[in-house]
A protein has these predicted regions:
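Terminal targeting signals and extreme-terminal segments of soluble enzymes
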Residues: 1-153
Length: 153
């Protein structure tokens, strides 16, 4: 949801298939092409993000490409801050990541995390991306709420 994309449309609830009960945003063409990425609210009210690793997510060595993990982390910033955003427009101001372990084709890649602080315009988030083998990446980032950009006709 980087780049001032519209969170205002709200996430779509998926009703069928592997991702039934999960949500996704349809308003970010890059993430739709890169993922698709999903999130849901857990029983304890926390947010969990996930996607299924495919061949197109791998690098030449057969491991998940670091750029894919960073893109998923960027998605997770917005999913983890979903409630604080309240359908506002926002952009990623910073995103830091530490790569810890690999993922392979077919893995379920998940993320959990938390909002560290939410102010009027800035939201600070941290999380961990993992698969069944353990942690893959830790990350932290900052989201800034912005006004939607006017469309020029």
């Amino acid at each position: 949801m980087d780049g001032g994309d519209d969170v205002a449309g709200g996430p779509r609830l998926i009703s069928v298939g592997e991702w039934a009960g999960w949500r996704c945003w349809d308003s970010d063409p890059f993430e739709n092409q890169s993922g698709p990425f999903h999130f849901r609210v857990e029983d304890d009210n926390s947010i969990r993000c996930a996607f299924r690793a495919e061949a197109r997510h791998m690098n030449g060595g057969g491991f998940m490409h670091g750029g894919c993990m960073m893109t998923f982390a960027d998605f997770a910033l917005f999913a983890l801050a979903w409630r604080e955003l309240r359908n506002d427009h926002a952009v990623t101001v910073s995103l830091n990541g530490e790569f810890i372990g690999p993922a392979h084709e077919g893995d379920l890649v998940e993320c959990t995390g938390e909002v560290v602080k939410a102010g009027r315009s800035m939201i600070f988030v941290r999380g961990v991306i993992f698969n069944e083998s353990g942690p893959m990446m830790s990350f932290s980032g900052v989201i800034k709420k912005v006004r939607p950009r006017q469309q020029i006709s």
